[in-house]
Curated annotation (Swiss-Prot):
UniProt catalytic activity: (S)-2,3,4,5-tetrahydrodipicolinate + NAD(+) + H2O = (2S,4S)-4-hydroxy-2,3,4,5-tetrahydrodipicolinate + NADH + H(+); (S)-2,3,4,5-tetrahydrodipicolinate + NADP(+) + H2O = (2S,4S)-4-hydroxy-2,3,4,5-tetrahydrodipicolinate + NADPH + H(+)
Keyword annotations of the record: Amino-acid biosynthesis, Cytoplasm, Diaminopimelate biosynthesis, Lysine biosynthesis, NAD, NADP, Oxidoreductase
Name recorded for this polypeptide: 4-hydroxy-tetrahydrodipicolinate reductase
Function: Catalyzes the conversion of 4-hydroxy-tetrahydrodipicolinate (HTPA) to tetrahydrodipicolinate.
Active site: H143 (proton donor/acceptor), K147 (proton donor)
One Gene Ontology term, aspect cellular component: cytosol
Gene3D superfamilies according to UniProt: Dihydrodipicolinate Reductase, domain 2, NAD(P)-binding Rossmann-like Domain
Any one GO MF annotation of this record: 4-hydroxy-tetrahydrodipicolinate reductase
Source organism: Nitratiruptor sp. (strain SB155-2)
Length: 254
């Protein structure tokens, strides 16, 4: 059996990872990391707030936490490498660099969204962006009121695919807010906007707008189970890979 360590076991996705692995025929939860003060019982698994224990008892680690939590994990993994699947969004440049450095020692799979639908949507966005160069691009994402980072990592990934398809630098063309007398919209800019409310799991709309017509590509997640199942699939695939940095597209063969 593949021993899976869950980093962030008390979180929304972490709890679903535990549930989905309970009856898995290939992998099992061997250890769960939670913050100090949090009590959690997982039959057959060690529950700890020590990162080193998590690493020691895992064949592969799945991480769905916050950027600062992921940073702490990466720092310890650089000393004791183990395959890592991470879905934490909102990572800064330093944290991204730590992940890239770890990938030189062990296989690392990072994805801002683990769903098959989003993996395919990225491809559709790239093709549409390239073919419809005269169309304005606007991206709107909706999530629950508790999500801390904005825009979502998935929205930024979709924007990156759209920008690259047109040979643009996203950092130079992204607009994430409009207010006041700002003048006309430039042809190259890509709008990325975030809505927050209720218990929305996740909805992303990428719109391509022109005079007289428009196309909108939508993806709606109705359950976080899709993220948990995608991460488990990724973990099973990752353990047989060579050291390197991978995405969910690699796992799915896209």
């Amino acid at each position: 059996m593949l021993n899976v360590g869950i980093y962030g076991g008390s979180g929304r996705v972490g709890s679903l990872l535990i549930k989905n692995l309970q009856h898995d025929e290939v992998a099992r939860v061997s250890v769960v990391h939670v913050l100090k003060g949090i009590e959690l019982a997982v039959p057959g698994a060690t529950v700890t707030n020590d990162i080193d224990t998590l690493i020691q008892k895992s064949d592969v680690i799945i991480d769905f936490t916050l950027p600062e939590g992921t940073e702490s994990l990466l720092e310890r993994l650089l000393e004791h490498p183990k395959p890592l699947v991470s879905g934490t969004t909102g990572l800064n440049k330093h944290q991204q660099n730590l992940m890239q450095t770890l990938a030189q020692k062990t296989p690392v799979l990072y994805a801002t969204n683990m769903s098959l639908g989003i993996a395919l949507l990225k491809r559709l966005v790239a093709v549409t962006s390239e073919k419809l160069r005269d169309f304005d691009i606007e991206i709107v994402e909706m999530h629950h009121r508790y999500k801390k980072d904005a825009p979502s990592g998935t929205a930024l990934t979709l924007a990156e695919f759209a920008a690259k398809a047109r040979g643009l630098d996203l950092e130079k063309v992204r607009v994430s807010g409009r207010d006041g007398n700002i003048g006309e919209r430039s042809k190259e800019e890509i709008g990325v906007f975030a809505l927050r409310g209720g218990d929305i799991v996740g909805r992303h709309t990428v719109g391509f707008y022109n005079d007289g017509e428009y196309i909108e590509l939508n993806h709606t997640a109705t359950s976080r189970d899709t993220f948990a199942k995608g991460a488990i699939k990724a973990a099973k695939w990752l353990v047989s890979q060579e050291p390197g940095f991978y995405t969910i597209d690699d796992c799915l063969g896209l």
